[in-house]
Structures are given as structure tokens and as C-alpha cells.
Amino acid sequence: MFFFKGVVAVLSFFSAVNAAPFMKPNNGTGKYIPDSYIVLLKRDISHDDFELHKRWASDVHKRDVAKRGISFSGIGHSWATGSFRGYSGVFSRDTIEEIMKHEHVAHVERDQIGTSQGWVTQPKAPNWGLGRLSNSNPGNTDYTYDEGAGGNAVVYVIDSGIDTMHPEFQGRATWGANFIDKNNVDCWGHGTHCAGIIGSVTFGVAKRAAMIAVKVLDCNGQGPYSAFIAGLHWATEHAQKNGHIGRAIINFSLGGDNSPAVNQALEEAQKAGIFVSAAAGNFGSDAGSITPGGARLVCVIGNSDERDYRWTGQGPSNFGARVDIFAPGTDIMSTLPGGGSGVMTGTSMAAPHVAGQAAIQVSISGGGFDLSVACAFFKNSASASVKNPGPNTTNKLLVNGANGTKGPKQDENKPNKPPGQDEQPGQNKPPSQNPPPGQNPPPGQNPPPEQPAPSPPANPGDEPNPDGQPYPGDQPNPGDSGPSWWMPSGGLQPPAWWNRRPSFGGWNRPMWWNRPLSVWKL
């Protein structure tokens, strides 16, 4: 998972005269981009007022640049989804102070960059996570799932991109938007791995779901919060314009220091009717203290291992009241760019399991499943539990209702085989092995008593403003109460080639294509 290791402390609000609140990082290892800001406007302004404000801000910026004789790029991304309106940009100190004073501005924060927390741990391993979804007890590697396999759902993967040419995706993965560079390739691998868990033929939960790549991370696994917001806005708007609402899902395996701006963008997507599955984070600390756990409406997913323990090894799963449910996320085999596969561990791998199951529910219902209550549905129907969830944390573990699990209901009388692949010999899972010392306990042993994990390490200090002055917002103003949202109280059709008779681009449709259900041994 991609996270800024740290917790943002929200200082008292700074203002000159009715200035917007400004959130400054107090500690943490987040990388803050010089002179780069995210600006949110008040919810009650009209679209016309928003456009007028942007023109005004651009004029202020141009005048200041001309006066100073220096170069700042000004407004970059902007977004307007429902009542969520704002923009990001690179501004001088004087310009951002003028913007903060404007009557329409609700919040300003500095833009920042995060890095990867996922890693490949071994070259080859069986994917146990699918079998865990459809069986009452751990250890069974048969994966039983509904015949629809997510075929009328669309999943937006907001990440490092997707290798859309990977044969595991069978043409169901496409490029949507790129907010980080001009290269529509996944040069980091994290997004392709997440997409494979969602919908690849071999490793995926929903083997017929469509996936759309929204790239917000570069080849080093880094991306600014402003790109995260732009990606969320694009996905929400795309789903609305293309009739995907009610069938649309977002996988958000990203995060970091708590950001009201990113949290609000996540909540706006959920309010629009899109189910958002978000990774809880890999710090072994309270998920509610960071983004996306600070977004109250999204479904926050913790990482469980093969023995149904919360993962407490390297990159331990976060816990706390904002974790909604656990899902498999430890040593998960999935797709990698270039047609390959590999293993990663983290809540980044857990969230796509839930996104994939949401796609399955869409296909079970024929598009009539209410995605706004999907998270509660998964929690209430979970029959499995995590043995050491952590302080003040649910123990619910995702299941899909097959083979005697309680879970979301489906027709359990039909056998099931995945589209695109017959059962392969030699794929059965080898006997489980005990983890290395210091990781989760082997079967038959109780876990150590739960202790709240320490907070992420503190940053030695926030970098100084290049002009030698404090950043706007460094001085508190106890009188500012903050914005009102600070304490938040049509469908996709299968592609034309799907029902095409014997061939597609030289690829012959196999005999199992129209079979109802199958059982796949991993």
C-alpha cells in the first residue's frame, strides 16, 4: 500500500480576516511539495461562482508572478463533483495568502507525496485468498463463486496503472486517465497486482469484471495528493456520464497523512453511488488517524493472513474503529506487468478482495444491488472472524456465502469453474509453513496479548519555506471554527465481443464459456 508514514496534526486555524483554515503537517515523514497547495471551496457556492473564483485566483497569480519576476505554474487540476469543488496548483506565498482570505474558500492544505509500502516476498506461491472467501474454515483452496463473476460491474483502479495487455485480463482492463505522467504504462506494478486480485482469470475474485486504470502514481510509486483527488473526481464523473452508477466500484489502495481534501473526495465518490474499497494502512496503528481511514463513508479494509490472524509481521495491518472488515492480504499472488505474476503483502492486497466481491454482488443482482450499503452488507453477513483484530476493532472477515459460509447468498447447487482457465494439475497448495520469528503465531498457538502499536516515527522537522518565512497557516487562530464538513455527520454492458461466436482476434472461445458455475482448485 502507498502511504505517507505519519499522522498529520491539525493545528488551530490561521487567518488574517476570515481566512480559510490551513492544515500544516506537525510530524511524519510525508514529502511536502514546495509551493504546492490544495484548495477546497465552500459547499454552498454555485458552479458559476466556482468558475469566477478560479478566474479571480488566476488573475491574482498572474499579477504576483509579473511583480516578482519568478515562475509559478498556477492552477493545475480542478474538480467539481456535486458540492465538492476545488483545485490544486503551484502558487507564491502572497498568492496563497490572498486565496485563503477569499470568502468562498473553506480549506487550504499543502500538497504532498507518498511512497510504496507493498513488496514482493517470494517469486512463486499459491493464492490462498480466493479459497478463504468461499469456505467456512481456513486451509481449503477450492474457490466457489457466482456464475456472473462480476460481468456487469466496472472497477476503477486508482493506483499506478494497469498492464492492460496482460493475458490474465482478456481485454477487460482499459486505460481511463493519467494524472501523473504521459506514459500509459504501469512501471511500478502495484496497480496491476491490485487489478489482478480484483479480476484476473487465475488470481481474481470477479473474473469477468471490467477494470479501468486511473494512474496517480509514478514509476517510483509516488504521487501527490492533488493527483489522488483528480483521479477520484475523474472516476466519479466518468461513472456518472457513462451510466455506471449502481455498478461502479473504486479500489483505493493508497493513503497517508490525514488529509481532509482527499477524505472529502473519497466521500463524494461514495455519495455519488460508487462503492469505495480502501486499504487501512500498514503501520500497526489506528486506521482512523490517516487517509483513507479518516473518510467516514468508505469501506476500510484490514489485512488478514492464512490462519485468520490480523497480519502483525513486516508492514502490520492497521486496526481501530475505522476498520470495517478484514480480507486476505498476506502473501497474495497476483499479476505483474509484462505478463508475469508475483506475491505482495499489505492492506493494499486486502482491499481488492472486497472490491472484487462487490463486483460479484453486482452480477448476482443483475445491477440491483445497493452499493451504498455494500460495506454493512459484507460485515453483517460475515461468518468468519479474525483471531487478533486489535484494540477497538471488528473481527469480521470477508466471505462470499458459498460452501456453507454465511456471507452474501448465491446459488450453491451449481459447480463453478473460472472463465478462461480449466483446472490445472500441480496448483494445489503445499502444506502451510510457520512464519518467521516475530511474525504471526503458527497454528495451535495463541497470539500475544494485543498491545497498541507505536505511532509512525516522527519527522525530524518540516522543511523550511525557501523564502525563509513560515508557511501560511503556521500561526494558529483559535477563533476559526473550521468548515462545516470538518466533522462529517443506467449500467455497464458486457463488451460486444463477449457473446460473439466462435472467435475474437484469432482467439477461439472455449467450450466452458457459457457454463453456469464451476469449482476451481488453486
Curated annotation (Swiss-Prot):
GO terms for cellular component: extracellular region. Residues 432-459 have a biased composition (Pro residues). One of its GO terms (molecular function) is serine-type endopeptidase activity. GO terms for biological process: proteolysis. Residues 20-117 form a propeptide. Residues 127-405 form the Peptidase S8 domain. Residues 383-515 are annotated as: Disordered. Residues 383-397 have a biased composition (Polar residues). InterPro entries: PCSK9_ProteinaseK-like, Peptidase_S8/S53_dom, Peptidase_S8/S53_dom_sf, Peptidase_S8_Asp-AS, Peptidase_S8_His-AS, Peptidase_S8_Ser-AS, Peptidase_S8_subtilisin-like, Peptidase_S8_subtilisin-rel. Keywords: Glycoprotein, Hydrolase, Protease, Secreted, Serine protease, Signal, Virulence, Zymogen. It is found in: Secreted. It is an enzyme of class 3 (hydrolase). The keyword Hydrolase applies. It holds the Pfam family Inhibitor_I9. Its EC number is 3.4.21.-. Residues 36-113 form the Inhibitor I9 domain. It comes from the Eukaryota. Glycans are attached at N251, N392, N403. The active site is at D159, H190, S348. Transmembrane segments: none annotated. Residues 1-19 form the signal peptide. The keyword Phosphoprotein does not apply. Secreted subtilisin-like serine protease with keratinolytic activity that contributes to pathogenicity. Belongs to the peptidase S8 family. This is Subtilisin-like protease 10. It comes from Trichophyton verrucosum (strain HKI 0517). The lineage of its organism: Eukaryota, Fungi, Dikarya, Ascomycota, Pezizomycotina. The gene is SUB10.
